[in-house]
């Protein structure tokens, strides 16, 4: 592939090598000054001979959970670590309330920093004021207001996707769960993104390309990434996939415009919502649509795979959930009210998110972790101005900081916290004052699965609807159990991310449903 890219021979010239060295030194000095101003301890410094910080960063990737635990054991409130994106601050959950709505601590710049949004080809992750505002408003306002109208179409589309993607035989059949779920979700939700039949496969391909490129680039020192991005095979594949996506989305926009002109009806899709949310400002509709699609795609697939792997080992929970689905559907049909009354299912999803939250992005897993300690990070921000918190902690402009989510594993808050209890939040909802806070879509300082405060995930209500509709269909139509000899864990862990084991195999068989959804 290198013959198609920039000639790399000049990299061997002495002046280029010298420039790289000088750039590296200046970068390290600059990044170091921002956290040393507070005399904050650096947890994983590998010393002066770790010139490009490869040893420190690899330790973070390999042992992030244990490092974070060690950090809070030794330095209760805040400490610094070298990560894939430079030196970051890690703060205790006590800071969550100060972070929740602080105007100078932003989410989008954090995402851009985590996933190379400043580089060509990574526009999906780039923070841009107009697109960021439209992204939030279209999800928080237009999508939320349309959710009731979307329930029935989503139920129909997801049901069809399951019929198309899942086995149709009544005998047991082994499937690679992650692959089937990805294609089910991409097809079942495609109508709000794109009508083109090529969209579901494109979404899967694009998610893989973005994840592979991001992971490959993260293996290089930060100061060299702009250079190596020009010739890394994974990045070149991402560029090609992005070009194909632009062509596909342009074709779909023309089709939707013609369809609306012929029917006179405003369709329920993001292109229409972007127009409303833009208030006349120019914006990149293609990038916005892709950003929203991939932001939801990863989270939806991750949650659904995690819950299905749990259900494959718990037939009693499957029976209880089926009884709830039958009772609720007979009373309410497909509606927002029905989804609200699926309280045990709601609890099961919230408990999966408590035990194994997604955290950050789509890193490619390289280490398999089967045990869980009590520390992880759940909320990330970048300071867009210098920020001074109540205790005097100074966060310099451009500095990224993460809030630990380890209260989700706190025995004082969640008894027997290491144990997965699908009924935990179902019981909590019955306690006085807990009906709202114990719901799947309710972020609190004790449960940061969807973030916290005014910048909590704005699409969580849509995500909850898609997940519940999907699981209703699957519970009614399929039995599930672990595949023979399948002994792998439910999750992969890499750096500060916990991802579903998408390679896990299960056995499924078609069953005769008690009710027709």
From Swiss-Prot:
GO terms assigned for molecular function: heme binding; iron ion binding; monooxygenase activity; oxidoreductase activity, acting on paired donors, with incorporation or reduction of molecular oxygen
GO annotations of cellular component type: membrane
Keywords: Heme, Iron, Membrane, Metal-binding, Monooxygenase, Oxidoreductase, Transmembrane, Transmembrane helix
PROSITE patterns, alphabetized: CYTOCHROME_P450
Chief place of localization: membrane
Keyword Oxidoreductase: yes
Cofactor: heme
Bilayer topology term: Single-pass membrane protein
Location in or out of the cell: Membrane
Keyword Membrane: yes
Sequence intervals crossing the membrane: 8-28
Any one GO BP annotation for this protein: terpenoid biosynthetic process
Pathway terms, separated by semicolons: Secondary metabolite biosynthesis; terpenoid biosynthesis
Binding positions for heme per the UniProt entry: 457
Family: Belongs to the cytochrome P450 family.
Other observations noted: In A.calidoustus, the austinoid gene cluster lies on a contiguous DNA region, while clusters from E.nidulans and P.brasilianum are split in their respective genomes. Genetic rearrangements provoked variability among the clusters and E.nidulans produces the least number of austionoid derivatives with the end products austinol and dehydroaustinol, while P.brasilianum can produce until acetoxydehydroaustin, and A.calidoustus produces the highest number of identified derivatives.
Its biological purpose: Cytochrome P450 monooxygenase; part of the gene cluster that mediates the biosynthesis of calidodehydroaustin, a fungal meroterpenoid. The first step of the pathway is the synthesis of 3,5-dimethylorsellinic acid by the polyketide synthase ausA. 3,5-dimethylorsellinic acid is then prenylated by the polyprenyl transferase ausN. Further epoxidation by the FAD-dependent monooxygenase ausM and cyclization by the probable terpene cyclase ausL lead to the formation of protoaustinoid A.
Name of the protein this chain belongs to: Cytochrome P450 monooxygenase ausI
Protein source organism: Aspergillus calidoustus
Gene that produces this protein: ausI
């Amino acid at each position: 592939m290198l013959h198609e890219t920039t000639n790399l021979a000049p990299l061997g010239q002495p002046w280029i090598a010298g420039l790289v060295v000088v750039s590296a030194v200046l970068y390290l000095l600059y990044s170091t000054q921002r956290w040393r101003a507070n005399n904050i301890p650096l947890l994983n410094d590998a010393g002066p001979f770790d010139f490009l910080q490869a040893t420190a960063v690899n330790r973070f990737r390999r042992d992030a959970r244990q490092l974070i635990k060690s950090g809070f054991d030794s330095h209760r409130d805040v400490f610094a670590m070298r990560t894939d994106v430079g030196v970051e601050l890690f703060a205790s959950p006590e800071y969550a309330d100060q972070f929740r709505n602080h105007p100078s601590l932003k989410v989008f710049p954090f995402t851009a920093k985590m996933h190379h949004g400043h580089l060509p080809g990574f526009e999906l992750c780039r923070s841009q004021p107009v697109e960021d505002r439209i992204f939030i408003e279209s999800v928080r306002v237009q999508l939320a207001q349309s959710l009731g109208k979307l329930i029935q179409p989503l139920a129909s589309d997801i049901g069809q996707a399951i019929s198309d993607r899942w086995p149709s035989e009544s005998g047991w059949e082994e499937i690679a769960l992650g692959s089937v779920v990805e294609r089910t979700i991409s097809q079942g939700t495609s109508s709000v993104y794109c009508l083109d039949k090529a969209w579901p496969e494109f979404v899967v391909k694009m998610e893989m390309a973005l994840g592979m490129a991001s992971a490959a680039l993260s293996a290089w020192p930060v100061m060299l990434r702009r250079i190596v991005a020009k010739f890394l095979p994974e990045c070149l594949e991402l560029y090609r996939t992005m070009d194909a996506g632009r062509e596909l989305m342009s074709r779909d926009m023309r089709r939707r415009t013609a369809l609306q002109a012929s029917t006179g009806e405003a369709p329920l899709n993001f292109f229409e919502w972007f127009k409303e949310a833009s208030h006349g400002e120019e914006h990149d509709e293609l990038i916005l649509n892709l950003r929203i699609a991939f932001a939801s795609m990863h989270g939806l697939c991750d949650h659904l795979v995690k819950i299905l792997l749990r259900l494959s080992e718990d037939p009693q929970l499957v029976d209880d959930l089926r009884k709830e689905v039958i009772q609720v559907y007979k009373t309410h049909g497909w509606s927002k009210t029905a989804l609200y009354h699926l309280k045990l299912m709601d609890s099961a999803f919230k408990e999966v998110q408590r035990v194994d939250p997604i955290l950050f992005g789509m890193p490619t897993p390289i280490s398999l972790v089967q045990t869980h300690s009590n520390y992880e990070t759940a909320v990330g921000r970048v300071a867009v101005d210098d920020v001074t918190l109540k205790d005097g902690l100074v966060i310099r402009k451009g500095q990224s900081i993460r809030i630990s989510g380890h209260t989700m594993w706190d025995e004082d808050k969640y008894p027997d916290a290491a144990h997965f209890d699908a009924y935990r939040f179902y019981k909590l909802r019955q306690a006085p004052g807990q009906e709202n806070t114990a719901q799947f879509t309710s972020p609190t300082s004790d449960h940061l699965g969807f973030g916290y405060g005014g910048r909590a995930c704005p699409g969580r209500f849509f995500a909850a609807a898609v997940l519940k509709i999907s699981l209703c269909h699957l519970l009614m139509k399929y039995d599930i159990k672990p595949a023979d000899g399948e002994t792998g864990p439910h999750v992969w862990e890499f750096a500060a991310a916990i991802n579903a084991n998408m390679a896990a195999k299960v056995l499924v068989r078609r069953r005769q449903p008690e009710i027709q959804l």
